[in-house]
């Protein structure tokens, strides 16, 4: 047993092995890693230009018509109104809306180049109006006035934020259809975000 | 030395335990981690209103039925100079024809001659109708038809100004309305086209 170490040296070896085991253990989430989900996303107001009109008031003249009238003042038979298109579109988009980001500590060996090989993402989004309906934003005072909303996930992009930090961004495209909206003003909804890392 | 060996074994087991604990934690963290949260989203829709209307409309009144009304027998005294006296036809004595417009105006109701759609703060709009200056007479030379008491209606209410539903921007949710107006034929003596009547509809978001 000549080769056996003294108790003091054995203790040092144990400590060294413990430290080594910690360093060699695969790390995926250090305490320095931070997930930030934005609580509020106020989108740019929908403009008249986006709808395809120049003014908030539009007069649309219909073709003249002739109708027979009786002397007793009964209802005149008028032709069915054929409404002209008065605007361009009801579909509005808000692209690259940042909903969350993940900061990774570079001390764990993360780099912009290897972050995806070390951190695989599965992100689920669900958008719910204030009225409780899925894929809707609802008006603040009228639950029946809604904007149909669809969310499309964009690829997560990462960049070096500082010497010790890599930031990965969770962005989405939001597509709205205002054809079921009745009122002007603010429409509210909540996006539920579930991020699973592997 | 046995003790020391045993002691070393114990320590080695401790090392393995620590290593195992560290690995297990890493697997738990690295295997599958799930985080969730919510983001409130706000979108803002502008005010907007579209008024659809007819720029011109022509009303063709039906031709009154020609009648020959027999006012009955009459006997008149006639002098040798040719002067006749006795009962004569007068306003009071004329028999009623099928069409009589004395002291009355014809109220014309035209449904579905305007429509509105769009967005407003309240979800409603105000629709008003007026007759502009000079627009209250339809003329054919000296023959005139007076136009007055113009109203808008939406099938539920009627008036010179009404508050009505603004159901959104889609055609399928447009609100349709009509016009009522009175026509006075008391100064009309010509057949044919009488032109010049005007009304103005104004739709506003409220």
Question: What are the residue ranges of the model-derived segments?
Answer:
Chain B
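N-terminal small/polar-rich segments of proteins
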Residues: 26-142, 161-206
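Bacterial N-terminal signal peptides that target proteins for export
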Residues: 2-12
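Short, surface-exposed beta-strand/strand-loop-strand elements in extracellular ectodomains
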Residues: 138-155
């Amino acid at each position: 047993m000549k080769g056996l170490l003294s108790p003091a040296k054995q203790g040092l070896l144990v400590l060294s092995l413990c430290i080594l085991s910690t360093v060699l253990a695969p790390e995926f989430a250090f305490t320095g890693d931070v997930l930030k989900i934005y609580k509020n996303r106020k989108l740019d107001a929908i403009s008249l230009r986006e709808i395809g009109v120049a003014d908030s008031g539009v007069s649309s003249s219909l073709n003249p018509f002739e109708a027979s009238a009786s002397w007793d003042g009964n209802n005149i038979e008028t032709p069915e109104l054929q409404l002209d298109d008065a605007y361009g579109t009801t579909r509005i988009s808000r692209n690259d809306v940042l909903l969350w980001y993940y900061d990774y500590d570079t001390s764990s060996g993360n780099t912009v180049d290897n972050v995806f090989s070390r951190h695989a993402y599965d992100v689920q989004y669900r958008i719910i109006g204030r009225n409780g309906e899925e894929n809707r934003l609802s008006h603040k005072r009228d639950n029946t006035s809604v904007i149909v909303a669809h969310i499309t996930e964009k690829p997560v992009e990462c960049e070096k934020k500082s010497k010790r930090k890599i930031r990965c961004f969770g962005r989405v495209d939001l597509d709205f259809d205002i054809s079921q909206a009745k009122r002007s003003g603010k429409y509210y909804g909540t996006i539920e975000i579930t991020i699973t890392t592997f | 030395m046995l003790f020391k060996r045993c002691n070393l074994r114990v320590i080695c087991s401790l090392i393995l335990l620590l290593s195992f604990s560290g690995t297990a934690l890493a697997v738990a963290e690295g295997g599958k981690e799930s985080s969730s949260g919510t983001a409130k989203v706000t979108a803002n829709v502008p005010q907007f209103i579209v008024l659809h209307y007819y720029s011109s409309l022509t009303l063709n009144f039906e031709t009154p039925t020609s009648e020959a009304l027999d006012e009955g027998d009459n006997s008149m005294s006639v002098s040798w100079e040719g002067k006749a006296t006795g009962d004569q036809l007068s306003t009071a004595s004329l028999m009623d024809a099928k069409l009589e417009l004395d002291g009355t105006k014809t109220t014309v109701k035209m449904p579905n001659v305007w429509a509105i759609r769009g967005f407003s703060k309240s979800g409603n709009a105000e629709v008003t109708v007026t007759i502009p200056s000079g627009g209250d007479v339809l003329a054919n030379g000296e023959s005139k038809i007076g136009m007055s008491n113009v109203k808008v209606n939406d099938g539920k209410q009627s008036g010179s100004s009404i508050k009505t539903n603004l159901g959104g921007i889609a055609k399928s949710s447009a609100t349709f309305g009509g016009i009522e107006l009175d026509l006075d034929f008391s100064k009309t003596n010509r057949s044919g086209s009488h032109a010049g009547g005007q009304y103005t509809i104004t739709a506003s978001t409220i």
